[in-house]
Swiss-Prot record:
Keywords: Allosteric enzyme, ATP-binding, Cytoplasm, Glycolysis, Kinase, Magnesium, Metal-binding, Nucleotide-binding, Transferase. The lineage of its organism: Eukaryota, Viridiplantae, Streptophyta, Embryophyta, Tracheophyta. GO terms for cellular component: cytoplasm. It comes from Triticum aestivum. Belongs to the phosphofructokinase type A (PFKA) family. PPi-dependent PFK group II subfamily. Atypical ATP-dependent clade 'X' sub-subfamily. Pfam families: PFK (PF00365). SUPFAM superfamilies: Phosphofructokinase (SSF53784). The gene is PFK. The active site is at D48 (proton acceptor). It is found in: Cytoplasm. Its cofactor is Mg(2+). This is ATP-dependent 6-phosphofructokinase.
Length: 68
């Protein structure tokens, strides 16, 4: 996407696990470098439950219940 294209966005939502969240940081750094005023919100969702800042991720409980 070009900088002109990104100007239509005010917010970006990223849904996923720890790898996705690391990617969101890279996107955030690029927005910052380009001085784009776009908010990024990370929504944790994974089966591994390995995202450090939360107790349980969406998807984890479903995986546990399905395995039982």
């Amino acid at each position: 996407f070009s900088r002109k294209t990104w100007r239509i966005f005010l917010q970006v939502y990223v849904i996923g696990g720890d790898g996705t969240m690391r990617g969101a940081v890279v996107i955030f750094e690029e927005f910052k470098r380009c001085r784009l005023r776009i908010s990024i919100t990370g929504i944790p969702k994974n089966l591994d439950n390995d995202i450090e800042i939360i107790d349980k991720a969406f998807g984890f409980q479903t995986a546990v219940e399905s395995a039982q």
